[in-house]
A protein has these predicted regions:
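Membrane-interface junctions at transmembrane-helix termini in multi-pass inner-membrane proteins
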Residues: 159-183, 371-402, 444
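Interhelical loop/hinge segments that connect adjacent transmembrane helices in multipass membrane
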Residues: 2-31, 205-211, 223-267, 306, ...
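Helix-loop junctions and terminal segments of transmembrane helices
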Residues: 83-100, 172, 289, 293-335, ...
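Membrane-proximal transmembrane or re-entrant/amphipathic helices at the cytosolic face
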Residues: 2-22, 471-535
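Hydrophobic alpha-helical transmembrane segments
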Residues: 151, 181-232, 252, 401-412, ...
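Interfacial segments at transmembrane-helix termini and the short loops linking adjacent helices
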Residues: 131-153, 328, 336, 345-375
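Transmembrane helical elements of multi-pass membrane transporters/channels
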Residues: 33-50, 211-227, 240-313, 373, ...
Length: 535
């Protein structure tokens, strides 16, 4: 990195431009390395997330799974509300401060933790006291366990809030492999194991939900240990925040509070609405469909958490061109990795839902609708991160509120008559509204192109290649599991064939050099645009 940023010996008029190009190359390599780690973790998380969905649906049936998913929805939405946007505030604030005993990063922790934990305690107490009234509506299908299940769910909110915030701090103070180990390995691997053990032991929904929550407590302890060293906790680091620490942090975080709740609870709002308006069986079907949709989104999530601190640094220094270059690169990665998943989910929805059980195949239309909507979500890239890391959380709030308004309005109209399919149509419309609005805002804020010709080529090639494979599978064996197997075989054969092309192999070599940090990769990739600092 030192060599990449050293001023050239013949720096003259071109010095600033060359420095900007070097900065862009360094940041592109850094994003490549972080992105790969995030993607590998997301792949493991997606696999075990699918295993968890199979365990819940097979172990508890449609009605029981509906109650289980509704309980997860309660804790997810409550946690998102109680964090008050502080997790994104940490991702924004910590990279701009100094770590260590003599640094000022540790002062952010009390600012970020105290208000959300107090909110979590209030919600836990209020939820437990009102469990008798809420359980029959929110957790229909859970029988006599409804009261205990909802009480346990609310009681866990402070723990999950603390875990969420410390995970954000961990991402900023340790290499990404530490975050991946906790968020993408510990949590997703432990949950299906413990929930499955509860189901096999006939422990019921209460035991199953306990199995889902225990890994959160383990992750909280792991995060505490991992963030203590870099922040200088217990070694004399200053923890008493100044008045400006409070005002600066919460001016950024509070507008994010509502949008964070909407982001985290977008699917779960649909599950809860479906449970109330259409019954637990439809909620179970919609929850199962949603698990597939969220699994496909993990590639984008892995990329987002990998580069958010990097975007915060770049945008904080006014280097918008470099930030846009990182965004464009990662959009291509996310598109190439996510679109095949969603296209296959749309075409072979029947095959995927058969894995949960025959009663879940009623969700085929819902799966198709949501899979197509997610092409929009992944196609625009992580525009939300550009807004948030650029300090424009208010604009992000506007886009998420627009999406939520569309989702809830259409849901109240469509769910009573169409069940899970109505919920999917409502959510799909909300997804498109939120992402297209955020993309427009991000383009205006960054002032740089967010879509390149390479992005369009990647989109066309992905749709064309997966479309051919899916068509062969459908014509050969239908839309069930045999057809899916044929389509996957054709895709694998196509990928192997692409590896024989010199241009493809050259592109892979460039990417691998970026991951290793080779300067040659920067030359192969070409110079980055000049900085737009102060534009």
């Amino acid at each position: 990195m030192t060599a990449a940023t050293r001023p050239p010996a013949d720096a003259g008029r071109d010095g600033p431009q060359r420095a900007a190009a070097d900065t862009g190359a360094v940041e592109t390599r850094r994003s490549a390395r972080s992105g790969v780690a995030g993607l590998l973790g997301a792949a493991v998380s997606g696999l075990f997330g699918f295993v968890l969905a199979v365990v819940i649906t097979r172990g508890y049936g449609t009605a029981g799974a509906g109650a289980f998913f509704a309980a997860i929805g309660v804790v997810t939405v409550a946690t998102a509300v109680c964090t008050l946007g502080a997790e994104t505030g940490l991702m924004w604030a910590v990279p701009r401060r100094r770590l260590g005993v003599r640094g000022d990063a540790a002062r952010v922790l009390p600012v970020a933790l105290i208000p959300p934990l107090l909110a979590g305690l209030v919600v836990a107490v209020a939820g437990a006291l009102s469990a008798d009234a809420l359980a029959p509506r929110l957790l229909r299908g859970s029988g006599d366990a409804a009261h205990g299940l909802l009480t346990l769910t609310f009681a866990a909110v402070p723990v999950v809030v603390a875990m969420t915030l410390l995970l954000a701090a961990l991402r900023c103070v340790r290499p990404i492999r530490a975050y991946v180990g906790v968020q993408f390995l510990l949590l997703p691997v432990a949950r299906p194991a413990l929930v499955g053990a509860a189901a096999l032991a006939s422990g019921g929904l209460l035991a199953g939900m306990t199995g889902w929550l225990v890994p959160a407590a383990l992750a909280l302890l792991a995060c505490l240990v991992l963030v203590a060293g870099p922040l200088g906790l217990g070694r004399g680091a200053a923890l008493r925040p100044t008045r400006s620490d409070w005002s600066t942090f919460w001016r950024f975080a509070l507008p994010r509070a509502a949008s964070a709740a909407i982001d985290a609870g977008s699917m779960w709002v649909g599950v809860l609405l479906t449970s109330v308006l259409a019954g637990p069986a439809d909620a179970g079907v919609f929850g199962a469909v949603g698990r597939y949709v969220l699994a496909g989104q993990l590639a984008m999530q892995g990329l987002r958490v990998a580069v958010s601190p990097q975007l915060s640094r770049l945008l904080g220094r006014g280097e918008r061109a470099a930030a846009a270059a990182v965004h464009r690169q990662l959009t291509i990665w996310g598109l190439v990795l996510s679109w095949p998943v969603y296209l296959l989910l749309a075409v072979f929805a029947l095959a995927f839902l058969q894995l949960f059980g025959r009663e879940f195949t009623a969700g085929v239309p819902a799966m198709t609708v949501l899979a197509l909507a997610m092409l929009v979500n992944t196609g625009v890239g992580n525009v939300q991160s550009l807004l948030l890391m650029g300090g424009r959380s208010g604009l992000h709030l506007v886009s998420t509120l627009a999406g939520l308004t569309v989702t809830v309005s259409l849901g109240l109209w469509l769910i009573p008559g169409h069940g899970a399919t109505g919920a999917a149509l409502a959510w799909a419309a909300g997804i498109a509204t939120e992402n297209l609005t955020a993309a427009g805002f991000a383009r205006s804020v960054v002032g740089e192109p967010l879509v390149s010709r390479a992005t369009l080529y990647a989109a066309a090639a992905t749709v064309g290649g997966v479309g051919v494979a899916a068509a062969v599978g459908v014509l050969a064996a239908g839309r069930g599991l045999p057809g899916l197997a044929v389509a996957l075989a054709v895709l694998v054969a196509g990928c192997v064939g692409l590896l024989t092309l010199p241009r493809v192999r050259a592109g892979i070599r460039v990417t691998m050099r970026q991951i290793r940090g080779s300067d040659e990769a920067a030359t192969a990739a070409g110079p980055a645009p000049a900085s737009t600092r102060g534009r």
